[in-house]
Design a protein with these regions (language model features):
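Ubiquitin-like/PB1-type beta-grasp interaction modules and other compact soluble beta-rich domains
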Residues: 1-81
């Protein structure tokens, strides 16, 4: 299982705090997970944004980060302000 959490605007857009997904062989990296989620269509396309940030097991990482069964993943937009 992969536990996925959505934060800030992603949570609002998707109407979902998080979900648990079965891990499988075509989910080797965070990029592949993100592609599968965005492919759901509709509001899920928000996860295809260039400025998406992610964390694996509470550590910030790149989308190239390998995924393993039991990981906790978080997706959130970049922080901006003025």
């Amino acid at each position: 299982m992969i536990n996925v959490q959505y934060f800030a605007r992603y949570r609002e857009t998707l109407g979902l705090d998080g979900e648990s997904l079965d891990w499988h062989a075509d989910m080797q990296t965070l990029a592949q997970l993100r592609e599968q989620l965005a492919a759901r269509g509709g509001a899920w396309a928000v996860l295809a944004e260039q400025n998406l940030m992610c964390a694996r097991n509470q550590d910030l990482c790149s989308l190239a980060e390998p995924l393993s069964d039991g990981d906790d993943v978080a997706f959130f937009p970049t922080v901006t302000g003025g």
